[in-house]
Amino acid sequence: MYRGKKGHTTTARHIAVLELVRPLIPSDAEVILLGDGEYDSVGMLQWIEAHARWHLVVRTAQNSLVQYGGHLFPLSDLPVEPGISLTLENIGFTAQDCGPLLALACWELDCEDPIYLISNLDDAKMALKYYKRRYRLETLFSDKKSRGFPIHKSHLSLPNRLSRLLLAASLAFIWMIYLGLSAIVTGQRTLIDPTHRQDKSLFRLGLDWLTHLPKWGQPIPLSFFLSPDLLFHKSVR
């Protein structure tokens, strides 16, 4: 945590965080860094190439410049249409010609606008497949804020106190996932979600389960470890 204004932070701060994370990752692990437009800087790309040697797929702006075929132009010049994805290989990113990289313009039918990605992967389909996993993180943010734990309303302003709150909320998040899985595996999901389909997330099921257990006089299980019995149970989708 650090004290700053709302919005994007600097490349230097992102790299400082990644420097802390990098020693925790096994040296033989394959790492795919997924990020939004804050991670598309030349400085970030150069750091990954020089220090981490990870794969990455990050979003970039439509006015980002790429060099391709001897021309420098913004990605918005690509003739992409709804339902169509375009890929440029061996591009140089920005006027600094950082690369070679992939540039992707993807416009899915259910989206109002295309998104633009850059990646150091060789396979455009795999790059897009990996990037789609990033959307799962958005549910984590909403679960910790507006849809679950309203930590954004804590009114805490000191970075060290916010760090402790975030740590506690993260442990509680894992606990809610455990409770949600437990409700499904034990066949009691219908007590808190009486529908024929599962509309609620595992987190939401766990939070509702925590609310109802004391009402029924049942003990509240506390665990942060998801056993194989829970993870691979036939009832869990």
What are these regions (language model features)?
Residues 1-237:
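Single, function-defining residue in the core of a domain
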